[in-house]
Structures are given as structure tokens and as C-alpha cells.
Amino acid sequence: MNIAIVGSGYVGLVTGACFAEIGVNVTCVDVDWNKIEKLKQGEIPIYEPGLKELVQKNQKAGRLDFTTSLESVLDKVQVIFSAVGTPPDEDGSADLKYVLQVARTIGRYMTDYKLVVTKSTVPVGTAQKVRHAIQEELDERGLDIAFDVASNPEFLKEGNAISDFMSPDRVVVGVESEKAKELMTKLYKPFLINNFRVIFMDIPSAEMTKYAANSMLATRISFMNDIANLCERVGADVNMVRNGIGADTRIGRKFLYAGCGYGGSCFPKDVKALIKTAEQNGYEMTVLKAVEAVNERQKSILFHKLDTAWQHGLAGKTVTLWGLAFKPETDDMREAPSLVLIRKLLEAGCTVRVYDPEAMDECRRRLGDAVIYARDMYEAALDADALLLVTEWKEFRLPAWGVLKKTMSGRIIIDGRNVYDTDEVREAGFEYHCIGK
């Protein structure tokens, strides 16, 4: 089977590499010539565990190719996945210009049946706009060529995307015809031979499912952060509370960890987009507005804890950040809590030293020389008055407290992810602060 994936960013590249791995012939398309040339050389523009090896393996096998020209591959593919970006407009709504550009290109050059599948996260009603854009181009050409549109939202977790795609807990597909359903079944069956967990539904429901899923997860995070902040005020321990409620099978244990807020390319954007979709349809998403407000407040919580610990002001202090990416196992700093924290520290007159196993280049791109970049976690702590854990990378979980005691000037440790044992850190001679206790 031959397919094209338009958009060779995070979603498109993972999708293309994983389909190629099960024997599908895949052409990944992107308008960025430099990106495509690097991909042809096996250079991956993002960090995702296992992705580089998967891309290179399938390139070598001849199942994965890259091009800047969608029109050049249309005649040899039957299914086109659109995985282009949908950046938020100023009002929070999703910008569909790239999605519709892909649709128009398909309509302009297609010569036989195509199934056009939207993989990007898009608002309800986008598939119909895609259908209309393709049909407009066909009408302008005076051609009557059959085609289908479908919705197949991704549910990949950065840092675990390959496993998520190869062994999904479910695949959501919105279709309008039996032919589209048959093609999507054929594509996904190899991933789900032992348990075919493809959930077919109408297209609007599939489009809504993606937004609803991410918004639900964001809600759990903000709820637990709210509970954590209350725990601090009443003398409770949020970790004990988490264990108590997580044991309830109706609730479960996932996404119940308190911290310094969520970030990334999905949750913030999708919550905003769903709020905007509701407004456009005369409805107010009261809960999601609160979720968003709690998260923005939580991104500043480490700064406020530090400001409280140093009652005589932060100016002139040196502060170390362990972790820059919005979560471990990625270099993604989009909407990361670290960015809010760094901005506030710099505004307060602090010197900021940073280290992250993967996001240093991304931080340099965003912040330039505003912060000091260290080569490792202990160099980052050199002469620091305080150390703040922002991203819970594995290498940060068992630090040598004795080394830190010799390296740091001060004794303040603020744990933004509740990784460390309170007694252990305090017995090592540090002033320890965390979230929710």
C-alpha cells in the first residue's frame, strides 16, 4: 500500500516511520526544503526516543522517502494523511490555513480516487471544509473524481510516541463511507492483530474526541494542582491524597501528579481551541476556563516559593534550573513552565543557570545569552543560591547531595515535581520545598 504523509513535523514523522515499519510504502512531504534534505540524510529535526533509528532503518529498506512536492506523489498514493500544523490564532482558535492548502493542492492535481485523512488536531467541522476545498478545485478543473475525507486524530505522548503508535490503546477514525472504512481498517490492522481496537465513528465525533481527551487530561492536572495548593494550607500531603483517590477504580492513578503546570504543543493549544469552539457556538466552557487559569497560576508557583523563602529579595541571587523541556524525554519547550519561571527570575534580577539533557539547543534558540548554559547537572549548580527541579528527567532523580552541598553557595532546593524524599534532602542539610505538602 502506498500513502503520503503531508507535514514532516512530530506527528507526521512518527506516523510515516511507524507505517513504513509495518510494510507500507510512505512518502513524507514537507514544504521546508532544508528539513527534507536533512531527513534524506537521516538527520531528525526533533528528539524522540527510537525515532531516528526507525527512520533510518526504513529509509534503507526503501519504504520511507521524503519530498517537498505533494503533486509529484499523488498519482502513486491512494491515502493522504494531513499532519500539518494548526497554530493558534490570537483569539485561541486553530488556524487551518495549512490544512486547507493541502486540500487545495490535492484537488488541483488528483487524477483518481483519494482518501484524505486529517491527522492534525482540528476543530469540529474541519473535514467538511477540507471536502469543500478539494471539490472547489475539482469543479474549477471541470472534473468529477470521487474522493473521501476522514478524521484520524493522534494520541501520541511525546517521549513515548513510537510505542503509542505501534501498540495503541485505541485508534479513533471518523469516516463517511464504507470504502474509507475499509482502507483505514487495512492500514491499522497490522498494529492490532490480537485486539482490533479501532473505534469508528462519524467525523464530527472523531474531531471532538481529540479535543475532549486532551482537555480531560489537562483538567485532571489542574485539579490536582489546585488540591496540592490547598493541601499546603491545611497541613495535608498531596501524595497521600493522590494514593487515596487513585485507588478508586472510577478515578485511576494516571495524571494525578501535582507539579508546576502543564505545557507542550497539545494541552495548552487544545484547551484554548475548545474554549473558542464553544464561544463560536454560543456556549461557555466554564470548567476549561478554570483549568487554563489554574495552569497559568501554577507555572509561577516555584518563583513564588523562592520569593517567599528569600524574604529580602531575589536581586543578585544565582538560581539553577534542572530541566527546561515541558516534560522528560523530549526537547520541546513550547508553553513550558521553565519559560515563565526564567522570565520572572530574570525580571527579579537573578542570574539563571540551566541544564536539560535534550533541550539546551532549543533554549539557546529561544533565550540566547539571557541564561548561563551548563554542560551537566552539577556544573549548573555551581555557586547557586537555590536549585529548582522543573522537569523530572531520570538523571535528576538521585542526585549526590554531598556534591551539591560542596557545589552550591546556598541551601535551598525547590522540587517542582515532588521527586525527592523530604527527610533525605533535609538530613543532607538543605532547606527543602515541594508541591502540596
What are these regions (language model features)?
Residues 1-437:
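Structural/interface elements that position substrates and couple domains in central-metabolism enzymes
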